[in-house]
């Protein structure tokens, strides 16, 4: 993808079009991935400016460690020899290796990136496997209940799923004591409701482990087995291992970026726009995907494929993943399917009424995590809003719709005259003069926070685009939404500072969005 160089700042640049975008997302594609049941036819890092203008850090929801980051379980390193799988996976193409959960494999070649050649000691077959599905045999990393280096916050998000029974648990590394571990357990009582307890697992000089010194174990496996039978001081005995999503593979399979059209089956239309459609479908009869199509003649193929090139370069657990593409017309872009659709639809739907502030703040933290990565990679999204965030299982949120994203040089990208963008979400310097930076994305994030706290209300209610721009230029900012803490509104207002350089970084924003009130710390 060719990067767009920044233009000189010129106050005389004419104002941009105030035409609102279509109700669909950029390029006329629908933002939602919520099925409407239409049947298918058969057929180098750039340093960010540090945010140092705030004298004291915000404590939005209690004093909590601001070094936390949202991460997923990281279990596999550069392994060799015998490994054990911690998930079941069916082969997707002929060169793949199918395996069952806790199957032993021998690694044959681990020098080809994220796809390794392995031999099954059970079936005798050989093929490629995703490296993040395995761990050294007989190691703690191979245990289903071991989640490694995830944070307190992430463990809380996973365990607070209402479908988890009392006693659902996981073991993770301690964030405060090197070499120690933490047992996180879901609990419920009428006073507190669903909550999480965290118990520090200490290590003996002799190599054993204990939670209370009166009961000691030679291994973590023995500790887990004991507390699965006896509560013995815990809030509840251990019942179920905390469920988590399958590890995300890089691409659909090894060397499967360009795929044949016939390998895709379009099944349910999720929406359509002027330039094309989005479908839920299946690849190779094995893998659920979302497929973006382009109507021939409505847009240059090069412009459409530009989104795929951006997504291929930007890879992070909080960004929707590009899987593959069909680059001959009609062009298809194959991306990760997110089962709950757009965040906007999710907030306004049946599930939205059950979301409470801690969950909304956690969702905001996930979005900030994804955008902090975009920030580090020196890109600008340009269309950050709830309609362009997708939601999956367990309230996982990922930034999507990179059709307007650009690599920025000299910290600024200037849009072409006449470019259209969502005015109510766009920073004044971008809406009026087309000057986009990561700081204009920060402004948009502040607007997105209002969407979260109001369960999807349109920003600046009762105002048209021209009125919004005029009043914002004269200093107007939206008031604190109902039931929103003043400290969170203060964070929004930091995002809406007139001088872009005085707005916070996404890294800072992520650190401030710490829903400590949802975690009942017992360690």
Swiss-Prot record:
One of its GO terms (molecular function) is non-membrane spanning protein tyrosine kinase activity. A lipid is attached at residue 2 (N-myristoyl glycine). Keywords: ATP-binding, Kinase, Lipoprotein, Myristate, Nucleotide-binding, Oncogene, Phosphoprotein, SH2 domain, SH3 domain, Transferase, Tyrosine-protein kinase. It catalyses: L-tyrosyl-[protein] + ATP = O-phospho-L-tyrosyl-[protein] + ADP + H(+). InterPro entries: Kinase-like_dom_sf (IPR011009), Non-receptor_tyrosine_kinases (IPR050198), Prot_kinase_dom (IPR000719), Protein_kinase_ATP_BS (IPR017441), Ser-Thr/Tyr_kinase_cat_dom (IPR001245), SH2 (IPR000980), SH2_dom_sf (IPR036860), SH3-like_dom_sf (IPR036028). SUPFAM superfamilies: Protein kinase-like (PK-like), SH2 domain, SH3-domain. ATP binds at residues 270-278, 292. The active site is at 383 (proton acceptor). Residues 145-242 form the SH2 domain. Homodimer. Belongs to the protein kinase superfamily. Tyr protein kinase family. SRC subfamily. This phosphoprotein, required for both the initiation and the maintenance of neoplastic transformation, is a protein kinase that catalyzes the phosphorylation of tyrosine residues in vitro. This is Tyrosine-protein kinase transforming protein Src. It comes from Rous sarcoma virus (strain PA101T).
């Amino acid at each position: 993808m060719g990067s767009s160089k920044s233009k000189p700042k010129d106050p005389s640049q004419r104002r941009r079009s105030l035409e609102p975008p279509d109700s669909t997302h950029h390029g006329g594609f629908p933002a939602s991935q919520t099925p409407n049941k239409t049947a298918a036819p058969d057929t180098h890092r750039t340093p960010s400016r540090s945010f140092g203008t705030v004298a004291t850090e915000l404590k939005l929801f209690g004093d909590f460690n601001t070094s936390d980051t949202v991460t997923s379980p990281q279990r596999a390193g550069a392994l060799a020899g015998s490994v054990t799988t911690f998930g079941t996976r069916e082969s997707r193409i002929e060169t793949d290796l199918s395996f069952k959960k806790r199957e032993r494999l021998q690694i044959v070649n681990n020098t080809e990136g994220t796809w390794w050649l392995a031999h099954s000691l059970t079936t005798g077959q050989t093929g490629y496997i995703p490296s993040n599905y395995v761990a050294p045999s007989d190691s703690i990393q191979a245990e289903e209940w071991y989640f490694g280096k995830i944070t307190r916050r992430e463990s809380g998000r996973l365990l607070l799923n209402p479908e988890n029974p009392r006693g659902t648990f996981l073991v993770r590394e301690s964030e405060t004591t090197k070499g120690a571990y933490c047992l996180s357990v879901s609990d419920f009582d009428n006073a507190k409701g669903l909550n999480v307890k965290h118990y520090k697992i200490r290590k003996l000089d002799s190599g054993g482990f204990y939670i209370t010194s009166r009961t000691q174990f030679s291994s973590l496996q023995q500790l887990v087995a004991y507390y699965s039978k006896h509560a013995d001081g815990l809030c509840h005995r251990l019942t179920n291992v905390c469920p988590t999503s399958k590890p995300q593979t890089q691409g659909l399979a090894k060397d499967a970026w360009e795929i044949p059209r016939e390998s895709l089956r379009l099944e349910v239309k999720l929406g359509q726009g002027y330039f094309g459609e989005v479908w839920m479908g299946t690849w190779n009869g094995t893998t659920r995907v979302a497929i973006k199509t382009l109507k021939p003649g409505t847009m240059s193929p090069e412009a459409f494929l530009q989104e795929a090139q951006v997504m291929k370069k930007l890879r992070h657990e909080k960004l929707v993943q590009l899987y593959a593409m069909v680059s001959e017309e009609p062009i298809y872009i194959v991306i990760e399917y997110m089962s709950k659709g757009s965040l906007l639809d999710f907030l306004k739907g049946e599930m939205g009424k059950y979301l409470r502030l801690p969950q909304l703040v956690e969702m905001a933290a996930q979005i900030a995590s994804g955008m902090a990565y975009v920030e580090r990679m020196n890109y600008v999204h340009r269309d950050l809003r709830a309609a362009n965030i997708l939601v999956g299982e367990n309230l996982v949120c990922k930034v999507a719709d990179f059709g307007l994203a650009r690599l920025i040089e000299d910290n600024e990208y200037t849009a072409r005259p006449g470019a259209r963008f969502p005015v109510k979400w766009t920073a004044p310097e971008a809406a009026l003069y087309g000057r986009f930076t990561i700081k204009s994305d920060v402004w948009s994030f502040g607007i997105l926070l209002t969407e979260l706290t109001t369960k999807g209300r349109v920003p600046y209610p009762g105002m048209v685009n021209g009125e919004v721009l005029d009043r914002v230029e004269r200093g107007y900012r939206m008031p604190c939404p109902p039931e929103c803490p003043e400290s969170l509104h203060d964070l929004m207002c930091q995002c809406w500072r007139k001088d872009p350089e005085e707005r916070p970084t996404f890294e800072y924003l992520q650190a401030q969005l710490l829903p400590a009130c949802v975690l009942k710390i017992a360690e």
